Amino acid sequence: LAPGVPGTVRGMALAHKRFGKLPWKDVVMPAAELADKGFVMSESLAGGLSREVGRGMQPYPASVAAYGKRGGGAWAAGDRLILPDLAKTMSAIATDGPDAFYTGWIGDLIAKDMAAHGGNITKADLAAYQAKERAPVKGTFLGYEITSMPPPLTIRASIGS
């Protein structure tokens, strides 16, 4: 399957433009600060992250490096998870807006990684991406109303058709 251009950053910016009251930087910078300072993990998070680092992330050394415990070993409840790369990324997005992600150094890294691993997302694809507001898809399932994202991201094929 071909991956789609990540839309979260432009989507959040669109929502902020339409509904936001605080400055963009004030909304996004706390995420950078949390990633920089880290947070204490629960038993559930520590166990799940240790399992993923030990198994699911093994084919992806950069993910193991980002989420693995420094010095190796399993995460435990009470350990602090610090994500310096995420902090740097979120800080750039907070300061420079979505363009930091789509046309700046973050986009350069995404395009470079895609090219190195046979992906098909280019810097031009990232630069051209625009978030769009669309009406949700609605249907019923077992008597419940189900609301989902419209195409291209939808669960309609499995539930609403």
What are these regions (language model features)?
Residues 1-161:
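Feature marks proteins synthesized as precursors that undergo proteolytic processing into two chains
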